[in-house]
Amino acid sequence: MTNIRKTHPLMKIVNNAFVDLPAPSNISSWWNFGSLLGICLVLQILTGLFLAMHYTSDTTTAFSSVTHICRDVNYGWIIRYMHANGASMFFICLFMHVGRGLYYGSYIFLETWNIGVILLFATMATAFMGYVLPWGQMSFWGATVITNLLSAIPYIGTDLVEWIWGGFSVDKATLTRFFAFHFILPFIIAALAMVHLLFLHETGSNNPTGIPSDADKIPFHPYYTIKDILGAMLLILILMLLVLFSPDLLGDPDNYTPANPLNTPPHIKPEWYFLFAYAILRSIPNKLGGVLALVLSILILVLVPFLHMSKQRSMMFRPISQCMFWILVADLLTLTWIGGQPVEHPYIIIGQLASIMYFLIILVLMPVASTIENNLLKW
């Protein structure tokens, strides 16, 4: 009798994705982040669901409902901080996952890559709206500043902003709709992640060498299931260290002050995972130019497959491109640092130079490095 795992209409889908999936024998720990992102998403949906049971999306009670969760709800504090720090872990995994894709040329799988970029946008939108919900000072002013950017769009800008706000300022209507969207988006992300996986399984995984591995495949289970469990344990360990020892390490103290439209915080800044994009936005003196640069800083990922000039897929055997990649990583870290600094003399010019470098590396220097390496192969 054939195994039910291989015959049952539902079970065989799971089987072909997680058990009998042929996987390259040499994929490294950089390939763990896909499953870690899945774990992060499930964790965020579960903790978010329990938070939503006690949260109220009304401007008068939102802040105190979060306080109530932390003080009065059984284990509410741990659920709240797992959700807040879970978002940080989510973005760490996302950045690692995208970085892996860039380094090893995984972007050659066009459909998988483009759905991944959409997933990144959706996750960023979800995180932004989630940050507004506690209705602290940084929630309110972050929402005001970021939504206001849309007013830079010619002709329809102002109407668009007021339509999103549901009034003439960020108020009750804005908070309610942000809560609604924040609740629904993770399920859309989950659906997109399944499509992402569907397209990946059409081609099979890439591997560190970038060379097709059809001749050398091993079953996903037990080899990579056990490897993923190790990754998951490390992820949960780091998350729980954050939650239990320094839950507010990555947060902003201003968000412990209830939202006050009459009092602007001295330094408005988003959560750490948006700082690189925020630095790019701020480094351009023109409003519309800044907004375009902000969107392009992420949207540029769509162009990466078309800028691939190398005869090799992976950067494993391309030292010049490797150098460019790590300069890009250093540049992103610089932008993240600048995004959290006040807008004054040394930081402005550093931010502008780092922003120029970011686009220059991706659009010019990486393709040039690839072309040089192609010519070096002829020697």
UniProtKB/Swiss-Prot annotation:
SUPFAM superfamilies: a domain/subunit of cytochrome bc1 complex (Ubiquinol-cytochrome c reductase), Transmembrane di-heme cytochromes. Binds 2 heme b groups non-covalently. GO terms for molecular function: metal ion binding; ubiquinol-cytochrome-c reductase activity. It comes from the Eukaryota. The chain crosses the membrane at residues 33-53, 77-98, 113-133, 178-198, 226-246, 288-308, 320-340, 347-367. Signal peptide: none annotated. Its cofactor is heme b. Heme b b562 binds at residues 83, 182. It holds the Pfam family Cytochrome_B. A ubiquinone binds at residue 201. Keywords: Electron transport, Heme, Iron, Membrane, Metal-binding, Mitochondrion, Mitochondrion inner membrane, Respiratory chain, Transmembrane, Transmembrane helix, Transport, Ubiquinone. It is a multi-pass membrane protein. Heme b b566 binds at residues 97, 196. Its main location: mitochondrion. GO terms for cellular component: mitochondrial inner membrane; respiratory chain complex III. Heme 1 (or BL or b562) is low-potential and absorbs at about 562 nm, and heme 2 (or BH or b566) is high-potential and absorbs at about 566 nm. The cytochrome bc1 complex contains 11 subunits: 3 respiratory subunits (MT-CYB, CYC1 and UQCRFS1), 2 core proteins (UQCRC1 and UQCRC2) and 6 low-molecular weight proteins (UQCRH/QCR6, UQCRB/QCR7, UQCRQ/QCR8, UQCR10/QCR9, UQCR11/QCR10 and a cleavage product of UQCRFS1). This cytochrome bc1 complex then forms a dimer. Component of the ubiquinol-cytochrome c reductase complex (complex III or cytochrome b-c1 complex) that is part of the mitochondrial respiratory chain. The b-c1 complex mediates electron transfer from ubiquinol to cytochrome c. Contributes to the generation of a proton gradient across the mitochondrial membrane that is then used for ATP synthesis. Belongs to the cytochrome b family. This is Cytochrome b.
